[in-house]
């Protein structure tokens, strides 16, 4: 019985990373405002990728909504976002992991311009 349990645990451990790789990365908007533009760049650069808000049906990410992130490898990124009040903010050193959700909270929006 122990042998069977051990085999099951080994198979489960091998299967979990596969499932995570199949799930998309997602951004969870925990700010107070709807986001109209959301860009990612490798940390420390200004090589902004495509507007990820275009991945959403209405082109925006409401407060407490999740957004599918596409064409972005796991790694450490800076994010630039624009909200409905036209405030532009940079959030640095976000860790994006395959199949995981990362979030930005209002209190993290310290580098903003209007």
Predicted regions, residues:
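Short, ordered, surface-exposed loop/turn motifs in non-cytosolic proteins
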Residues: 32-44
């Amino acid at each position: 019985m122990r042998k069977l349990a051990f085999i099951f645990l080994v198979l489960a451990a091998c299967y979990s990373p596969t499932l995570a790789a199949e799930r998309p990365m997602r951004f969870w908007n925990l700010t107070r405002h709807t986001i109209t533009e959301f860009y990612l760049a490798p940390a420390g650069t200004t090589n902004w990728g495509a507007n990820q808000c275009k991945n959403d049906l209405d082109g925006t990410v409401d407060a407490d909504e999740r957004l599918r992130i596409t064409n972005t490898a796991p790694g450490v990124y800076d994010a630039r976002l624009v909200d409905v009040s036209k405030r532009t903010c940079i959030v640095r050193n976000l860790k994006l992991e395959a199949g995981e959700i990362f979030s930005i909270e209002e209190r993290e929006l310290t580098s903003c311009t209007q």
